């Protein structure tokens, strides 16, 4: 995924009301930009740290700027626009980068499924049957470790998705939880038991029921983001 034009850079002053952030440009101009992230953004940002944002030319938008990338307290880069994850994964799927899911004949987005009224991010059609793929964006890192964690806040919705996938797996239908790691300097992923123990239990239960768990890391900068490598998932604390 190429940013065109390339992202603009600023310095974070504050994030507030979940969806707003004030930044300062190099020339001293201050802007309010949209924050497209409903999570806690734990360890994803710091006041005074560098941020990169895209700018829309749509005159109907109240806030033309959208926060895309943040400098973390550990000096990493994190893509904080969670809406990018599905597009990145689709791009990687179509390019054959995600080897475990290569060879599909059709791809459908946001397909209704399950007993709890969910929509799966992708349904892939293979000659031998479908695969249901749920995507989660991972941006939580910690100091002195290259292991990222998910989630960064309690997510009942995330646990519901795991239950839905587990139900499919028990029926013999291929079900995949895919973590898109939009954070530099990461070598593995784990469930964040310390933040949401219920989600971590649901993940381990889903794996026991046959759900596949994959993680792929992304390379990112102000010009592009691209999924480029598989990462191990560490299920045991």
UniProtKB/Swiss-Prot annotation:
Matching Pfam families: SfsA, SfsA_N
Matching PANTHER family: SUGAR FERMENTATION STIMULATION PROTEIN A
CDD domains membership: SfsA-like_bacterial
Annotated family: Belongs to the SfsA family.
Protein name per UniProt: Sugar fermentation stimulation protein homolog
HAMAP family tied to this protein: SfsA (MF_00095)
Gene Ontology molecular function: DNA binding
Segments forming a coiled coil: none
Gene: sfsA
Family matches, as NCBIfam families: sfsA
């Amino acid at each position: 995924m190429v940013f065109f034009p390339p992202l603009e850079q600023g310095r974070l002053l504050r994030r507030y009301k979940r969806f707003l952030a004030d930044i300062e440009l190099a020339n001293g101009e201050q802007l309010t930009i949209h924050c497209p992230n409903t999570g806690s953004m734990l360890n994803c940002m710091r006041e005074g740290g560098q941020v990169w944002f895209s700018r829309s030319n749509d005159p109907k938008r109240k806030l033309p700027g959208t926060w895309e990338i943040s400098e973390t307290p550990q000096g990493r880069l994190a893509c904080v626009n969670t809406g990018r994850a599905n597009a990145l994964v689709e791009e990687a799927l179509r390019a054959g980068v995600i080897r475990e899911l290569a060879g599909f004949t059709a791809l459908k987005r946001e397909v209704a499924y399950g007993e709890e009224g969910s929509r799966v991010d992708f349904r892939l059609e293979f000659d031998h049957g479908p695969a249901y793929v749920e995507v989660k964006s991972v941006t939580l890192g910690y100091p002195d470790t290259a292991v990222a964690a998910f989630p960064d806040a309690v997510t009942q919705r995330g646990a519901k998705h795991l239950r839905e996938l587990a139900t499919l797996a028990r029926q013999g239908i291929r079900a995949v939880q895919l973590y898109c790691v939009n954070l530099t300097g990461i070598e593995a992923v784990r469930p964040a038991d310390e933040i949401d123990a219920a989600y971590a239990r649901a993940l381990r239960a889903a794996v026991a029921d046959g759900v596949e768990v994959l993680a792929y890391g992304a390379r990112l900068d102000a010009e592009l983001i691209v999924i480029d490598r598989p990462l191990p998932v560490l299920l045991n604390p």
